[in-house]
Amino acid sequence: MHLTSREQEKLMLFLAGELAAKRKARGVKLNYPETIAYIASHLQEAAREGMSVAEVMQYGATLLTVDDVMEGVAEMVHEVQIEATFPDGTKLVTVHNPIR
């Protein structure tokens, strides 16, 4: 199987997001890279499942709270931006202040 660079990035993001989700489920507070991976992978999946851009942006702001991340991480994450594949093509999705 041959994967393009973009496909490899998406796969790595998915794997990092899965690891972060498992840690979150066990009650482990997420660090910065885990936080970004968790949010980004959920945004990718939401877009793939057919949500609109606006719905994905709103959804992204509901995924994590300050209690889910290590101290200081919420203040470091001002936005999460991804290129997501929607049924009608690839679009840029930005979630501002995703940890509330």
UniProtKB/Swiss-Prot annotation:
It is an enzyme of class 3 (hydrolase). Its main location: cytoplasm. The keyword Membrane does not apply. It is found in: Cytoplasm. GO terms for cellular component: cytoplasm. It catalyses: urea + 2 H2O + H(+) = hydrogencarbonate + 2 NH4(+). GO terms for molecular function: nickel cation binding; urease activity. PANTHER family: UREASE (PTHR33569:SF1). This is Urease subunit gamma. It comes from Haemophilus influenzae (strain ATCC 51907 / DSM 11121 / KW20 / Rd).
